[in-house]
Amino acid sequence: MPDRHGRRHLAGVVLDLRGNPGGLLNEAINTASVFLDGGVVVTFERRGAQPLRLDASAGGDTRTPLAVLVDGGTASAAEVGTGALQDRNRAVVGGSQTFGKGSVQEPKVLSDGSAIEFTVGSYLTPAGRSLDGVG
């Protein structure tokens, strides 16, 4: 709808993350930053280390209504971003249960050139929820 000056504004945004297997954690934080004004997006917990809190950048749009669509193909970083927007009461989340990958893996290259991944930590949403195995 145009405002009184004739400018058009978004009535709302639908962020469709169905079938999104995740990707880079930084991109999840960048995406959440578009809709948040700073504050925690995710906490990374690693055995034997202090938890690392990762925050959104300041200045995101906190007013435009936001809905996030998810399904069983929504995983990893896509779940992290969704969890942040949900826990921070910034978005309505709809669809079906997500994949439930809230663990962090690091690869170790073996002497024969192959690699194996080890789980080294987990992600927690701003409310302290683990998504691992839950979605």
What are these regions (language model features)?
Residues 20-76, 103-108, 124:
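Gly/Ser/Thr-rich loop/hinge elements
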Residues 10-23:
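Short, glycine-/small-residue-enriched flexible loop/hinge segments at domain edges that mediate gating
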Residues 88-101:
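Short, well-structured beta-strand/strand-turn elements
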Residues 17, 70, 120-122, 135:
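Flexible glycine-/small-residue-rich
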